[in-house]
Amino acid sequence: MGKRILVVDDEDVIRKFLRIHLAKLGYEVREAADGEQAMEQLRKDDFDLLICDIMMPKKNGWEVIKEVKSNPKTKEMPVIVLTAKNEDSDMFKGYDLGVNFYMNKPFTKTQLLYGLKLMFDDTPEEVRA
């Protein structure tokens, strides 16, 4: 079974794009439309990577990341931020919270593949190329 990735974004089109492309690469993808759904899934299941938007209803991405990084069960899980917040201060805040890779919207498939390459040593051949 491939690595398990939780994609958290309130935009359906973003989640669908990620689900399709990540599944083609052999990853198992779960989705959440907001931070509360994300935390519920993280309590129930184990994931190898979190891809998280910042600006979401109910619980924003910063709150999700703080909880993930403060929980002994999930603190080592890598996090990719995917957001329209493209100020340097936002990026620095993410890295201060323990984010591993920061992608601005709109993003490209190449940027996504590069982020996966950084997160996993055993990436699919398409990602390593």
Summary of predicted features, one role per range:
Residues 56:
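Receiver (REC) domain active-site loop signature in two-component systems and cognate sites
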Residues 6, 31-49:
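Acidic, metal-coordinating helix/loop segments flanking the phosphotransfer/catalytic sites
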Residues 16-24:
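Charged docking surfaces used in two-component/phosphorelay signaling
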Residues 107-117:
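C-terminal output helix
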